[in-house]
């Protein structure tokens, strides 16, 4: 069989850079023991990955999703949100707790924009040091 080139795969994945990312990810999967979907023909893993993409034995969208999942550090789990009625009910029942268990509320001073700007203008810049 002829060697796989980028031109064989560019019909399946439009962006060459994305093709390189997908093929390299698939080659890593193969080297980690993933099952290949075509005959190896004594080819190396990157060539096998490109041939799988060219022969459409793997979906580029599935590869892309798997690549994104492998790069994620924190995976969000979709959990059903509470409806407004149960939230309000929870607040009403929590209001009957002892006052000793309730945390103290923190009060903040309110400041207008003019007061904030006047305070910023009144700041003195620090003297230059050799730390920079």
From Swiss-Prot:
Top-level class of the enzyme under EC nomenclature: transferase
EC number(s) reported in the record: 2.7.7.6
Gene Ontology process terms (BP): DNA-templated transcription
Keyword rRNA-binding: no
InterPro entries referenced in this protein's UniProt entry, alphabetically: DNA-dir_RNA_pol_omega (IPR003716), Pol_omega/Rpo6/RPB6 (IPR006110), RPB6/omega-like_sf (IPR036161)
Keywords linked to the UniProt accession: DNA-directed RNA polymerase, Nucleotidyltransferase, Transcription, Transferase
A Pfam family: RNA_pol_Rpb6
SUPFAM superfamilies per UniProt: RPB6/omega subunit-like
Segments for region (Disordered): 76-105
Catalytic function, reaction form: RNA(n) + a ribonucleoside 5'-triphosphate = RNA(n+1) + diphosphate
Molecular-function GO terms, alphabetical: DNA binding; DNA-directed RNA polymerase activity
Transcription among keywords: yes
GO cellular component, one term: DNA-directed RNA polymerase complex
Superkingdom of origin organism: Bacteria
Family indicated by similarity: Belongs to the RNA polymerase subunit omega family.
Subunit structure and binding partners: The RNAP catalytic core consists of 2 alpha, 1 beta, 1 beta' and 1 omega subunit. When a sigma factor is associated with the core the holoenzyme is formed, which can initiate transcription.
Function as written in the Swiss-Prot or TrEMBL entry: Promotes RNA polymerase assembly. Latches the N- and C-terminal regions of the beta' subunit thereby facilitating its interaction with the beta and alpha subunits.
Name this protein carries in UniProt: DNA-directed RNA polymerase subunit omega
Gene that specifies this protein: rpoZ
